[in-house]
Amino acid sequence: MTQLKWLLVVVFLLFSLAEGIYLVYKLQVSDMTLRQYFLQRVYPVIMKMAGKTATRLEQKGVQPPLSFYTLQAVQNNDSVLDFSAFRGKKVLLVNTASDCGYTGQYAELEELHRRFPGAVVVLGFPANDFKEQEKGDDATIAQFCKRNYGVSFPIFKKASVIKGTHQHPVYRWLTDPAQNGWNSKTPSWNFSKYLVNEAGELTHYFDPAVSPLGEEVIQALEQ
């Protein structure tokens, strides 16, 4: 029995060593810090164990007083994206951050982008509004997204998404009932999600804890 215990200890140590070597390698070939690596893996689990509820809002058939298709935004490569290009498509808008426990959702958003080509558009809006978890400049953010998650969907210039004088016009539309027709809910944290349907109507809001690949999001996209 003693020999078996020692064997298990040795196996555990070897496994831990191998995992440590892999972690060092992964961090060397990416732009992630050790803090970012563990935060992305631990934070969602802690939130789930704590029983933190995730807000979900849904409202269909409400015509927005201000057309969604009049909006535009500047991408982080300085090109202007006119939202009139999204007619006939669903659009998922997400405020993002590189140093958040939910940053791993970039990978899920990229999967959505690839799963529904031509039917669903994913848009990322980096923001430093929540605990300053997006301190990098636009070039740094673009490199981080591409290198760590292979992001190919549009990422816009960093801006504020919460209500105030500096709120991005797109997020002013998303959070002002006078513009979108019904919703006043602002992002509760990084990776809050808003869904606009093929007719340019805001139909859903999902809190950060709701996975982009979660059943309710997929159902909303497939409706």
Label each region the model flagged.
Residues P169-R172, D176-Q223:
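Thiol-/selenol-based redox modules, centered on thioredoxin-like
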Residues Y102-Q167:
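Structural microenvironment flanking redox-active thiols in thiol-disulfide oxidoreductases
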Residues Y43-F83, H168-P169:
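N-terminal "domain-start" segment that seeds a small globular fold
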Residues V91-L93, L123, Y194:
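Conserved hydrophobic packing residues within short motifs/helices of P-loop NTPase cores
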Residues M1-S16:
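N-terminal Sec-pathway targeting helices
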Residues A85-V91:
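Proline/glycine-enriched tight loop/beta-turn segments at coil->beta junctions
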Residues S16-Q40:
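Membrane-interface motif at the C-terminal end of an N-terminal transmembrane signal
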